Amino acid sequence: MKAIIVLLMVVTSNADRICTGITSSNSPHVVKTATQGEVNVTGVIPLTTTPTKSHFANLKGTKTRGKLCPKCLNCTDLDVALARPKCMGTIPSAKASILHEVKPVTSGCFPIMHDRTKIRQLPNLLRGYEHIRLSTHNVINAETAPGGPYKVGTSGSCPNVTNGNGFFATMAWAVPKNDNNKTATNPLTVEVPYICTEGEDQITVWGFHSDSETQMVKLYGDSKPQKFTSSANGVTTHYVSQIGGFPNQAEDGGLPQSGRIVVDYMVQKSGKTGTITYQRGILLPQKVWCASGRSKVIKGSLPLIGEADCLHEKYGGLNKSKPYYTGEHAKAIGNCPIWVKTPLKLANGTKYRPPAKLLKERGFFGAIAGFLEGGWEGMIAGWHGYTSHGAHGVAVAADLKSTQEAINKITKNLNSLSELEVKNLQRLSGAMDELHNEILELDEKVDDLRADTISSQIELAVLLSNEGIINSEDEHLLALERKLKKMLGPSAVEIGNGCFETKHKCNQTCLDRIAAGTFNAGEFSLPTFDSLNITAASLNDDGLDNHTILLYYSTAASSLAVTLMIAIFIVYMVSRDNVSCSICL
């Protein structure tokens, strides 16, 4: 007879593999890190710019003061500060001021001895205030001051609004009124009251006149050098007048006067009284400046054209495009970039990886190494994502959420650097406020040491930020792997290194849904099986019947079972030392 043996053959299809990974780029940039040195990355954010010189401008969002009195024609800022006749106008309020008169400028009213006093700094002092006004009445009655009575002297080179002889409105030239008091005098003291509104600084201008011996006797009845002292807020200044021997008149503006004046000022804080001790030739204070608020001062040039974020002594008006700049360091005011010594770049992407190459299949399941090295090309919509490999070829999809998290971290680093920038700007601003109180040195002070220190701090912060951004890639990939594992669930087997072998096909559509977080394994085909193949094998009848065949099978099976039992018994007895076994050769 014939016996039929049925062979069942189950054939499964090849599985797809899905891996997490990082994009690849063929145009890497270089950033500096704290511990890894220079690292190639897929993108950068430049943090520095090198400005070019431009004209000065008005600061955006605030009033910028050029000339102290723009409507005072043919007047220097010193003329305005001394209130020369025809130079008395409104000084506009401003948060920023341009120190545009680089060289000391004399007044066209009376020759002033600049080298004997700090008067050249008076316009700079006034520029340092936001609000400035000239008092409406005099602080002292000059005619009845100690040592008087006096008449107020005038000069033909100081014409008033009616073109008559005049003098500075801030001072009264106290000339003895008659011959009876044209005599030498011991030092006299006058008190200077505070007449401004509470909270304002009072800038009181005063001075003294000196001339040749002949003129001194004619005007004051004394040809000897005279002594003068001012005192306010604990600051005391002493002078002794010079008799004759003055510089050539051409050096003092070519004015016709034979004598010279020395002009000074004192700053009286709110409610504080000042004193002036004097002899003959005193220029007593009259109208005073009342000032408040702060206006940042910077050297520059006029006219002011347009608007700018920042005013820089060397580069003029700048519009801030980057937080930092390289080039020439100098004082700047406004919304300015901070000076750093070298160009800085922040990593804006991932560590550069050449295109990945799959390792050869290994083991029973043909597992692949994943992303030990290299990145995946085509991941143009993001930095991190997935790739699948199968009969469909290679599919790549970016994970936007993971990429956004990486971008958020970079943004956080940028914000941290911005906060550092603000803190450093506040420190620089504080330094400038200190300089306001030391206005005499404003023209010269540049704190290069502070700038170097801040530059080093910023550079280190950028290096550490780049280090953190690059090192965080492992965190993003691990999070991505956990996310992928959760989505795939039982429809895939983890094979290591961020890779999974799926029990279903995963083409580009499948991968896109994984990247979007909308993947559902049920929508894709489950493992497929080939149909059962049934093969009938005919056995020729050689005279064996069914009973004979069964007897052969039964005998063979029984013999095998007995042999196994005997072998087990012998091993057991040997292990208990009940049977010994010797092997001789």
Curated annotation (Swiss-Prot):
For this protein, the record's Gene3D superfamilies field holds: 3.90.20.10, 3.90.209.20, Hemagglutinin Chain A, Domain 2 (2.10.77.10)
Q: What is its main location?
A: virion
Subunit structure, interactors included: Homotrimer of disulfide-linked HA1-HA2.
SUPFAM superfamilies recorded = Influenza hemagglutinin (stalk), Viral protein domain
Protein name per Swiss-Prot or TrEMBL: Hemagglutinin
Location relative to the cell? Virion membrane; Host apical cell membrane
Which protein family is it in? Belongs to the influenza viruses hemagglutinin family.
The role this protein plays is: Binds to sialic acid-containing receptors on the cell surface, bringing about the attachment of the virus particle to the cell. Plays a major role in the determination of host range restriction and virulence. Class I viral fusion protein. Responsible for penetration of the virus into the cell cytoplasm by mediating the fusion of the membrane of the endocytosed virus particle with the endosomal membrane. Low pH in endosomes induce an irreversible conformational change in HA2, releasing the fusion hydrophobic peptide. Several trimers are required to form a competent fusion pore.
List the GO terms this entry assigns under cellular component, sorted alphabetically: host cell plasma membrane; membrane; viral envelope; virion membrane
One GO molecular-function annotation for this sequence? host cell surface receptor binding
Going by the entry's taxonomy, the superkingdom of the source organism is recorded as Viruses
- UniProt topological domain (Extracellular) ranges: 16-553
The UniProt entry's GO biological process terms, in alphabetical order, are:
endocytosis involved in viral entry into host cell; fusion of virus membrane with host endosome membrane; fusion of virus membrane with host plasma membrane; viral budding from plasma membrane; virion attachment to host cell
Q: Does the keyword Kinase apply?
A: no
Record-linked InterPro entries: Capsid_hemagglutn (IPR008980), Hemagglutn_HA1_a/b_dom_sf (IPR013828), Hemagglutn_influenz_A/B (IPR001364), Hemagglutn_influenz_B (IPR000386)
User: Which species?
Assistant: Influenza B virus (strain B/Victoria/2/1987)
